[in-house]
């Protein structure tokens, strides 16, 4: 029997039951990532990486809020399945806050143990932090078997201890002059398709810290005791040594090649927008608006934005973006209005467009892709036209009785309906057929097959003879100025002075030599 009932879950129950909404997949999956200078297929649990990122993001947010006067040193350590993130920030505000049940607890306790508690809910125009939903660090706590948060404001320290996904929690005040925040946790591997923080998680974390060091050069990052270096130009050139780099006050962008379709690596403030968003759309729209017309003028070929995009890799770091809009807690895509993005990043798209035109390594794959698409489209049109011709019935075709049978028949092409009347009187009905042309046949030299078949006479000739443009129907022989064609058993010898010319002014010889 199907139950018809309503359930009300607590925040923590909902997070555990629908974890994908908050931290992403808990399955061990294969994803393509760019790590240490090359694209790799990496197997890991995205949700587990999210737990580490949430704590790192909190420290980076403190640096952003204080314009890097504080939290300008962030240390990350991963050892024996235990993660520690420490910063030299101001510490989490320790003022007492009231919970929905009326209980008063210190601010750090609320931030680490209650979902939807935090200091980033103000959607004012000046907010530039990555945190926005108030669930980040509590998510890490919920999916940990051990979680210890320590924070100090220079006068007092608060230590919060939790275990088994916050089933057990306690806190204490300890007077002290230390200022900063330190979080240590061990993930609950029962919630994920893995049983350890293997080397791949260390590599992914180090790779992210290298990226953050590029985005925020004012922060000194260390990983397992070693300083992490950051330089945008060097970082971008890992993706493509020929990459075009442009650095503005609020945005750094690199445009390089991609042999396997469009690729991107983008950060907005400290958030990895792995599915891109409106900032990527803005950049591509503005670059293509200038680039596509120039390609058309220079190479006489039409190219679309989709064709340009599929040949490129974009590395884009946006800094100090105010009140950004992101999809869900996973924050994988930026959805801020286009106008806000354009006014903030101030990209010189025309210069990037000119640089692409002058960079053969990046430009030529775009041209080659456009040509390949054009040829494929033409071939498809030709095939369609040829198929149509093969099934067509030509009403003015006077058919030889043995046409299509095991006999050598001849098709006579006459100039006009009146001329074919003489043929009808003298022809051998068994072997001779005819078709009246309307004047001289179209000069089709240089035309595509699809365009040639738009001409009624050429279409009808192909329909009558079964010739398919582009396929060799006979063997061509050249002897001085004379050309010999063998067609259906008949040998026809012509030269350039014959009535049917070979230089392309008429079709019969010229086009047969070129196309058939």
UniProtKB/Swiss-Prot annotation:
GO biological process entries: DNA topological change; sister chromatid segregation
EC number: 5.6.2.2
InterPro entries: DNA_Topoisomerase_II, HATPase_C_sf, Ribosomal_Su5_D2-typ_SF, Ribsml_uS5_D2-typ_fold_subgr, Topo_IIA, Topo_IIA-like_dom_sf, Topo_IIA_B_C, Topo_IIA_bsu_dom2
Disulfide bonds: none
Cellular component terms (Gene Ontology): protein-containing complex
Key words, A-Z: ATP-binding, DNA-binding, Isomerase, Nucleotide-binding, Topoisomerase
UniProt cross-references to PROSITE patterns, sorted A to Z: TOPOISOMERASE_II
Cofactor: Mg(2+)
Annotated binding of ATP, by residue: 128-136
DNA-binding region: 369-400
EC main group: isomerase
Reactions the enzyme catalyzes: ATP-dependent breakage, passage and rejoining of double-stranded DNA
GO molecular function, one term: DNA binding
Recorded family membership: Belongs to the type II topoisomerase family.
Subunit-structure text: Part of the DNA topoisomerase complex made of gp39, gp52 and gp60.
Note: Binds both single and double-stranded DNA.
Biological role: Large subunit of the DNA topoisomerase that untwists superhelical DNA. Controls of topological states of double-stranded DNA by transient breakage and subsequent rejoining of DNA strands.
Protein name, entry field: DNA topoisomerase large subunit
Source organism of this protein record: Enterobacteria phage T4 (Bacteriophage T4)
